[in-house]
Amino acid sequence: FQRGKAEDWWPKMVALKILKQYYMATGDERVITVMTGYFKYQLANLPEKPLDHWTFWGEWRGGDNLDMVYWLYNITGDAFLLELGDLIHSQTTPWTAMFWGETNELRTQNSMHTVNLAHGFKEPVIWWQRSHDPKDLNAPKNALKIMRQTFGLPTGLWAGDEQVHFGDPTRGSELCTAVEMMYSL
């Protein structure tokens, strides 16, 4: 997935989404083989080199990885994928806790990268497929409620150019935030 000595889990998550789209368009079974092999590699290596080992991106965006693991599980039924999903979730930013206000990021200016927040909206709902906890399923809706009072904008997005900041009508939000939020929805 990466050339040379560049090691990071996050770019591989992007490649997994591309492989999924390719499979959905073509039905090419090689994708299933490649993803299965990669996920076995992840299961073997994540305990020693967690999602935040090389950069923080993997930890914040682990929901994208989890999404691809569950997608493959729904095709193959391979039990090791559920174990991997549990591991990925445990190494991912605790979005459900954040979205229920158990931490202060949603009430603190400059507390996180705005695009990471957009990525995070999908993780509790993806995890809900395994947890079946209504708190996970309802976490994104609760986050939006909190954010309307802090850095939310009338557009439904939130204020942020790199870092989130309190809503100011003269400042907008990144295009990448809008794109990732659409993907999360």
Where are these regions (language model features)?
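Glycan-recognition and catalytic cores of secretory/periplasmic carbohydrate-active enzymes
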Residues: F1-L185
